[in-house]
Amino acid sequence: TVGNGLFVTGKGEESHQINPSQTEEGVVYGQAVHRQEFGIYKGTFWSPKGSYLAFYRMDQSMVTDYPQVNTSTRIATLEPDKYPMAGMTSHKVTVGVYDVKTGKVIYLQAGDPTDRYFTNVSWSPDEQHIYVIELNRDQNHAQLVCYQAATGEREGVLYEEKNPKYVEPQHPLVFLPWDESKFIYQSQRDGFNHLYLMDTKAKGEGTWKNGKLE
């Protein structure tokens, strides 16, 4: 990323800008979103074979500025930061997919992103699907949603988790090398941090680890 833009460079090639070249005020591409919560520490996600690049697009033009002090300069200066205070309008996130071969970009058809968190982006081993754990702003209802990578079409919900207090997804899916239809899902749904063996072909909670151990 350069500034708020996202670029891709191949070996011996010039860099290609993925986002629109014109300036979009308050829009950031390819960087961590949602204040780096829910295990989010980056904003780009390469597919297993490098054919596609999924990325976050964060529109924070509707978020108010919060004054921060830059202490890295010799004389401290004020630098505004987009920070939504409790109950105020938060930024809106969408997930894009860049096709390396065609240079085209599509966006996952997730619906209105208002007051939603899009976390733990994962690729299927065959690069055909993208999985996103989506969370409401109240943080008490999470859904594991499957999308078509080539079109962005929403295929459906594989699993959902509710809790009257909160749900906090922290880890992307881990697919089994010997069975690409199976994956490991990490959750605290029973009060402890456990691993669950789940199947892309069957909706359900999965089973694996039980008991009062983490």
Give the label of every model feature segment:
Residues T1-Q17, S21-E25, P113, T119:
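A conserved hydrophobic secondary-structure block that centers on an alpha-helix together
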Residues Q31-P48, T94, N120-S122, P169-S181:
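Signature of short aromatic-glycine-proline-rich micro-motifs recurring in repeat-based ectodomains
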Residues E14-T23, I106-Q109, R154-E160, E205-G211:
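Beta-propeller fold detector
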Residues E24-I40, P113-F118, N163-H171, E214:
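Short glycine-/Asp-/Thr-/Trp-enriched loop segments that recur within the blades
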Residues T1-G5, G10, K42-F45, A54-Q60, ...:
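Beta-strand C-termini and the immediately following turn/loop, strongest in propeller blades
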